[in-house]
Amino acid sequence: MHYCNKDIGSFGETIAADYIKNSGYIILERNFRCKLGEIDIIAKDKNFIVFIEVKTRYGYIYGSPSEAITFRKQNKIYKTAQLYIMKKAIHNKFYFRFDVIEVILNTLNSNYSVKLIKNAFQI
């Protein structure tokens, strides 16, 4: 049984959050929203604040999940990240980067693979 896209995305974000916690990241925010857009996960990795876009798919039939992150989407994430940085007044305290996490599910959702792409894009 397939879930709707929102459920798939939410499930993938939970998998991604667990994955990065187990990798030593500290999650600061999930689903940070503002008028400019949304960032799936904001986390701290040593001296970096990391803005993470999570893409979840059933397989690679339409290409890799990260290929769905267009320049327009990257720009939206960047602008949202800028607002977050200003709101939290952290611009002089950390380095910043943009990561992507790909979650590939099987048709039963019982098995999955996770791929972390550090510094996936820069604006």
Swiss-Prot record:
This is UPF0102 protein CLK_1817. The lineage of its organism: Bacteria, Bacillati, Bacillota, Clostridia, Eubacteriales. SUPFAM superfamilies: Restriction endonuclease-like. InterPro entries: Restrct_endonuc-II-like, tRNA_endonuc-like_dom_sf, UPF0102_YraN-like. It comes from Clostridium botulinum (strain Loch Maree / Type A3). Belongs to the UPF0102 family. GO terms for molecular function: nucleic acid binding. PANTHER family: UPF0102 PROTEIN YRAN.
